[in-house]
Regions:
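Eukaryotic intrinsically disordered, low-complexity regulatory linkers and tails enriched in Ser/Thr/Pro
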Residues: 1-168
């Protein structure tokens, strides 16, 4: 066993900024790579990688060699889940635990408000490269998206954001 083992170099991904640190990567079964950086997860596509920012990763599942990531799209301050993307990892290295740790560390606070016969979840998350936290809302499944619900969301987001701004 060599005292100083040669470290593998991460794959080159177009779009990665000069000050962006590669945290981990994994080789996929189709010859691509999933790369985790300080800004998020670079997901392989047909032509190029695309960035899924840490603050937009809603859910990560690692099972049977497959990593699946559900990205949330922001629409009018609401987090709306996109369809999950998944990849079979040939060589996962430490990518799954690194991604899990980063996603968990990104969520600062979460609370649920009962409104309109349903519920809305409010989530404060860190945004890489910005100070403080940013609040978003997610209408929980089974809750109707009505004017009453939207008004409650707007009021609560304004209060939470004012509190966050005051604590900086």
């Amino acid at each position: 066993m060599a005292l100083f083992a040669k470290r593998e170099k991460p794959p080159v991904v177009d779009g990665v900024e000069k000050d962006e640190r590669v945290l981990s990567w994994a080789d996929t079964s189709d010859g691509g790579a999933v790369v985790a950086t300080s800004r998020g997860v670079w997901w392989p596509g047909s032509d190029e990688h695309r960035l899924i920012a840490w603050q937009h990763i809603d859910k990560v599942v690692w099972r049977d060699g497959i990593i699946a990531i559900t990205e949330a799209e922001v629409v009018d301050d609401l987090l709306v889940d996109r369809h999950p993307v998944s990849a079979l990892l040939d060589k996962p290295r430490d990518l799954p635990p690194v991604v899990r740790k980063r996603v968990e560390a990104n969520i600062v606070r979460s609370e649920v408000l009962t409104v309109g016969g349903g519920a809305v979840r409010f989530v404060a998350r860190r945004v890489p490269g910005r100070d403080g936290v940013h609040w978003w809302a997610r209408i929980e499944p089974g809750t109707s998206d009505t004017e009453t619900v939207r008004a409650a969301i707007s009021a609560r987001l304004a209060l939470l954001r004012a509190e966050a701004e005051g604590s900086r």
